[in-house]
Amino acid sequence: MASRQPEVPALAPSGPLGKMSLPIGMCRRAFSYDDALEDPAPMTPPPSDMGSIPWKPVIPERKYQHLDKTEEGAASVSSLAVTPSPATDSSDKAPVVKAKATHVIMSSLITKQTQESIQRFEQQAGLRDAGYTPHKGLTTEETKYLRVAEALHKLKLQSGETAKEEKHPASAQSTPSSTPHASPKQKSRGWFPSGSSTALPAPNPHTMDPGSGNDRNSADKWSLFGPRPLQKSDSGFAIQAYKGAPRPSPMEVMRAQATRVGEDPATFKPPKMDVPMVEGKKQPLRTHNLKPRDLNVLTPTGF
């Protein structure tokens, strides 16, 4: 052939066929893509043994024997009848339905397992006092698993009722007493009620500033910070956010300072400055008596 001649370059197209001059079945890799785009002929010629190419995938005999038989049966049925029979449709749709069913079963099993593990943890932690209303995603079967949210809601309701009951005896104390500067320590007993109650009420504003005229406004203002609920557990511990010791209000601090000034004005006065008298006494300080021979001690050694 012409490609064996040494003077002709190996990649140059020779003969009338051009790119097809290579042996059939051999793919030539180095050719101009522009010519190939313009040329309607295929870029690589089809192989010579077109009929012997195995178009069906090779399925090993050990595995998938059942699948191979079903495929062969479906092929024979489709070759006999032009319209595919409903048996083949059902055989095609069966694995899809099975997979979907297994997915649903697995998801329900997983949710049930997680719910049971949460339930077990709540039993150990002692948080199993009330139920839980499920969100829209949960099924009705899962509503029987109990939660803490409803317990907190019930505790808030109970604490609100106890706070209402404790407001009535406190209103009797809110009338200004004969001694307006009485210390609030006598009335702080109402802050910690005896017995086991579900909530510690907040410090009552009526007991904090009894002398002020706007008791009603301050009560409305402080009612926003309601009583904090206590979560009671089976272990006997009461869980509550620690807010520190009850701080006195600024009005209370100012009133306490005013009582101190009224009781003993001498103690509240600032101390007198006795600095000028002291300076007058210590005026005759000794002046430095430096003689020329003492300067040798004060000068650095390098001079």
Swiss-Prot record:
Protein name: Putative monooxygenase p33MONOX
Residue spans crossing the bilayer: none
Top-level enzyme category: oxidoreductase
Region listing for Disordered, in residue ranges: 1-20, 37-56, 66-96, 156-233, 260-283
EC number: 1.-.-.-
Motif placement: Flavin-containing monooxygenase motif: 67-77
Subunit architecture: Interacts with NELFB, NOL12 and PRNP.
Keyword Isomerase appears in the UniProt entry: no
Species per Swiss-Prot/TrEMBL record: Mus musculus (Mouse)
Domain of life: Eukaryota
Similarity-based family: Belongs to the P33MONOX family.
ATP-binding is among the record's keywords: no
Originating gene: P33monox
Keywords assigned: Cytoplasm, NADP, Oxidoreductase, Phosphoprotein
